Structure formats: C-alpha cells, structure tokens
Amino acid sequence: MSTDYSSPAYLQKVDKYWRAANYLSVGQLYLKDNPLLQRPLKASDVKVHPIGHWGTIAGQNFIYAHLNRVINKYGLKMFYVEGPGHGGQVMVSNSYLDGTYTDIYPEITQDVEGMQKLFKQFSFPGGVASHAAPETPGSIHEGGELGYSISHGVGAILDNPDEIAAVVVGDGESETGPLATSWQSTKFINPINDGAVLPILNLNGFKISNPTIFGRTSDEKIKQYFESMNWEPIFVEGDDPEKVHPALAKAMDEAVEKIKAIQKNARENDDATLPVWPMIVFRAPKGWTGPKSWDGDKIEGSFRAHQIPIPVDQTDMEHADALVDWLESYQPKELFNEDGSLKDDIKEIIPTGDARMAANPITNGGVDPKALNLPNFRDYAVDTSKHGANVKQDMIVWSDYLRDVIKKNPDNFRLFGPDETMSNRLYGVFETTNRQWMEDIHPDSDQYEAPAGRVLDAQLSEHQAEGWLEGYVLTGRHGLFASYEAFLRVVDSMLTQHFKWLRKANELDWRKKYPSLNIIAASTVFQQDHNGYTHQDPGALTHLAEKKPEYIREYLPADANSLLAVGDVIFRSQEKINYVVTSKHPRQQWFSIEEAKQLVDNGLGIIDWASTDQGSEPDIVFAAAGTEPTLETLAAIQLLHDSFPDMKIRFVNVVDILKLRSPEKDPRGLSDAEFDHYFTKDKPVVFAFHGYEDLVRDIFFDRHNHNLHVHGYRENGDITTPFDVRVMNQMDRFDLAKSAIAAQPAMENTGAAFVQDMDNMLAKHNAYIRDAGTDLPEVNDWQWKGLK
C-alpha cells in the first residue's frame, strides 16, 4: 500500500513530530529533572542558569520534520547543515527522536530517565554545547561563528553525486560576508559529478536585537536577488501550522523534484550547462510557538525571542506556571508514552538506518573515505649536487607532483584557492585538469576553465576556498588551499574554528578520523616587493602556533626538495592543520632529496656542508627557517668564513618550527638535551626567521640558551626590491653577519673593520636600488662558494 505523503493524516504525524522536537528543545533550555512534568514542577527541577537560545528553534525543527518527510518520499541521501548560530537543541532533539543519539550515547535512553539526562546536559557543566558541536550526531558544521554553512555544504557534496546538503541559512547569518558570497556557489556545482545543495533561508526577521535586512525586504526583491545568482526561490510563509505544513510539503516536493530533474538531464545527456537550482525561503516568526509576550513586550515575532524568553530559573520560580503552560502547549501526552518513549505513530514517519540525517555516513568521516594514492616524491627531485647552482621555482616543481596526485586520485583530491593557482605557479596541475567553472566559457580570453575540474579557484574569495576545503575534508576527502600568505589572515578565524572542531571531534570515540587541512602560504612576506606593505604579513604562523600543538604543524621548506618531502608528510597525515610557507619565485636549490627528507622527518638538522665546527663546540650558531632566511643565512656564513676562516660556525636549518618547542608545551618537542645538541647551552644563536620574531623568542624562553638574536619580519615594508624588504627588516646577509660579530664579545676589535664593510655594503645597496631600481649585482648574482 503506497503512502500519501501529502495527506492530512501524514501531515498530522509530521506536526506531532515537530511538537515533540519543540518540547525537547524547550526542556533542554530550562529543565534538569521531571522531563515530562509527571509531577508538579519544583525549583530543583529547573536549572540554576538556563543557557541557550530559542528564537530559531521551532522554525528549524519544522524544516527538519519536513526534510524527514522528503527523505522518506524520495529515498534521499540527505544531511543537515545548521547555519543559524544559536540553535544547538535542533540537531540534538531530532537525533534523539530518530534514535541516533541513543545509538551513539547509550546512556541517553529513549525513556524518562534518558530524557532527563538529555535535558540536564544541555549548556550545562560537563554537558554539551549550545551549538551543533562535534558531539552532535549528524553535524559537520558547528555554527558558532556565522557565515560558512553553504560553503561547508558545497564542499561536502563535491564528488558525492548522490548526496543533498540541506543547508538552513539564518537570515542574520546571511548578512555576513562569507555567506553573502557563498550564494555564488551555483557556478561551481557540476550536476553530473557532484551532489546538490538545497538552501533553506530561515527568514524569521530578527537577529539579537535588530531586524534582519531580508526580514524587511519584499518577496519580489528577494526573488530577483537570488535569481541573479542562479537560484529559484520557492516561498513559504505563515504562522498557522495547519496552513504551513501543506505549504512547506509542497515546496519541498517541488525543490527535490527540480534537483532530481536537473541531475537526470545532466547525467543522461552529459549536459553540464549551468542549472538554476531550487532554494526555499521560509518566513515564520522568530520564537514561533513560544510565549507571545512578556511584561507587555512582544516575544514571538520579535528580537526578544532570541535567547531565554521568560525569566524562570531555580532561584526564581515566580513565573514557573508560564513555563509549564508553554511546555504543555505541545501536548506531550500525545507525543510520548508514560515511560518517555515516542508514540508509535510518530516513529512510523522517521527515516531509519543511514537514511536518518543524523546517521548519514557523510557526516562522520565520509561516505567512502580513502587514503591518497601518492606518487613517490623522490621522482620529482631537483639536482643539488652543487649546492645553490641549480635555480628552480619550488611551486613549479611541486606542481608536477600535484599533477600526478590528481591523476592517481581523480575523485577525492582537489585544489582550492581565490584565483591564485596560476599566480602561485602551480602550472603543472593544468596538464591534467581544469578549473571547475559552470558559467559561460570564452576560449579566446579564458584559460583552463571547464564544467569539470579538480581545481576550484575561479571565485576570488578566501572564505569560499577555505569553507569548501573544510567541507571536503570533513567528509573524508583530501585537498589543499593555496593562497597569498598575507591574505590567509582573512580566514585565520576559520582556521581557528576548524581547529576547535578537530580538537573536540578527536575526543569522541565515535567520530572517525579526518584527513588534514592543508594550507599553502605562497607569495610570502619577503617576496612581496612588487605589491608592497599591504601584502606583507606572516602572522598566521604565530596565530596557529597559539593553538593546541597536537593539531597544528608549521613547515617552512627552504627549497623544492624540502617542499616535496613536506608534501608527502602532509598528505599522509590526519586531523591536523598543516600550514606550509613556501616560495614561488626562482631560487637556488640547496638540499638533496634525502637531506630534505631527513630535515622534514627530524624537523631540523645541522647542515655539515655549511658548517665549520666539525662537530665541536661552535663559536656561533646560525639557524634559518624559511626560504629567504636560508638564503640570507648561507650568504652571511660565506661572508664570515671568507673574512674569519677560523670562526667555528654551525648552521641549523629548521623546517618544522614547532618541533623546537619544549615537550612540556608540545608532545613532539625536542628534549632539552636534543635542543642543546643543535643550539648549545650558551653560544650565541643568530636565528633568521620567516615570521614575527616573538614566536622564536617564546620557543627559546624555556631552554637553557637565551643567547638569542632573532632576525625576522619587523613590520617594515614597501614596494621596493626583493632584497630591500630583507634589509628593511634586518633579515639580510649583511645584518645577519653583523649580528654574529656583535654576539661574540671577543670579536669586538677584530671584527670592527668587517662590521664597517657590512655597513658600507648596506649604504651601497640603498644608493644603488634608488638609482637602478634593482638589487646589487653582488646580491642578484651571488653564488655559494662553499667552505674550505
């Protein structure tokens, strides 16, 4: 017997389900005992500090109930992304009703005792968060920081052609920059190879204490707005459930059938033209089904519904009857049996097994997660038999490796960026793939654009690139986001949120592992001579270093072979944010592929061919982390050795900067004995660093050796020559060499003439670039001679 999913009888069950979800959601806000009000409510039943939000809840529960309906009707593989920031009860309540919550947390049983635990734990010490945190079944998006819901949904459905991301977007959230630009995602979803996103704009009209822009915008203008971005909005509006249920059911059916028609046409006819995707605009009051007013002020349909709408807590029970009336308005006796279990007629309409949105495998590590099939990075090695003689562009070399990663992993590896793949010299990838771009293509003026491709960089938005990558890796696939170093700061808060997700998810036994999030910082601070001061900011290194060390890796490979070795490590890793600072410009190549591998595996190494201490106690230790720091340090060592051949110099190259931290701060950190092996206990260390200097000072603070002289980025920059950026920050060879002399008191007299020579060279540099517009021949043509 077929089911009529639009019949009044079926929709009545949907209404009961919705009321049950609302009841659970209110109970989680206020109660810690007596969950079904089976006795009179007393103070000890109520939380001391009810914490959470109400305004978005009933609208989202309504949407969730109707998504369950279309899952049943059409046999969908669908998952839920909760964009509105403050609605943690939604996914908890619905996953509890469908049984997923109890499957994962068996102590939260589907009875009175389990319901009591469910209520008490919400926004409670030792309990669960008030957002859709990693503890929440079915969530890949916490929603604490607003704006990324559509980006995450799109990233998740890329290369998942059978999946639909039901993304609920708050009308307040839609005012954020990242969300506003993410509506353009239609231009990047290929209906042949990818799944679909069904955005549902939860238009309740208010934010914390202001109206929303969409809330005061007519349907006609909203329609025009979304149509301009290839969405077809379907409008549903009302506050009477008897009318809104059939209206939303009809709208959901229409949306799903349009999605299916788009995909059927595309897949059967190989038609990859840009479709017009459906979306739903759902207007219902903020705080729907809650208190209408309080103390003469409007609650439902106003900003006042945002958080805790009525003042009831354990210490103030004056208005407890209002809370009881609110809870009983959902008629819990029609919804739950006396033992707290859900009534059978409601259970009948809930999807089962993996069809439950909270149990969809995509939301827990992916549908079919696979490790990458990686080529042997050694096959791409650059010849360094004569150190520094070979000049290559690291990113071009690496792009050949990435090209073959794509070939070997055609369905689960992607590159993301904000229109910078070519600028960052990843040319090789386009030998095997294109940029995914669903808009019109003009062959005479476009390059590498196609409806299908493994590169998504055709939207100039760091937020989109980062959000897509996050959605992609949180659903079990692999990729990287390459961008200009300075403008990765645009998304450093997103990186923080991703770290927080990883940390919490890793603490849950039931959460599967995620591939790492790989961030490539190119066009770096000491290479931004042509774009100038605005493009010079290495601060993401410091920002990420402040996070829990188990989840953060920072690599500063000095040449192409080091970058190849780093790539092999990051693509095999899990549950990390790998931040790689690398070069795209022509540069001398230093380390053999085996040297590079050892440097990456150990994090650092003493470079024998650039050291003269022969394993004995050095007079001076030079350390370098980064491309320009390595070049300038080697040049400084050459200058010193030529003038002071008896000076015992040790050169330490650092690739994994955080490996230098104390094991008290970082489990991977070098022991004091290991640290002293490289840096000694008291000899002067001249450390050339790619980033802000305090990161290195912080590392040395816990160590024996405080005889440290750091040369990093000192917030000096301009449009000038490449070498002059280093001079401005005293991270050049002449200043490094001077620092080495100044750090050795015994050299005060014998080194005076040398220091003067260095000052003369700096003066010559300053005069020359202002006349010639380029760097000194002594700089541009410098070659490593070796240490005899």
Curated annotation (Swiss-Prot):
Subunit structure: Homohexamer.
Keyword Lyase assigned: yes
NCBIfam families for this protein: PRK05261.1-3, PRK05261.1-4
Residue runs in coiled coils: none
Family of this protein: Belongs to the XFP family.
PROSITE patterns reported in the protein's UniProt record: PHOSPHOKETOLASE_1, PHOSPHOKETOLASE_2
Induction notes from the record: Induced by sugars that are fermented by the phosphoketolase pathway (PKP) and repressed by glucose mediated by carbon catabolite protein A and by the mannose phosphoenolpyruvate phosphotransferase system.
Protein name (database record): Xylulose-5-phosphate phosphoketolase
Pfam families per the UniProt record, alphabetical: XFP, XFP_C, XFP_N
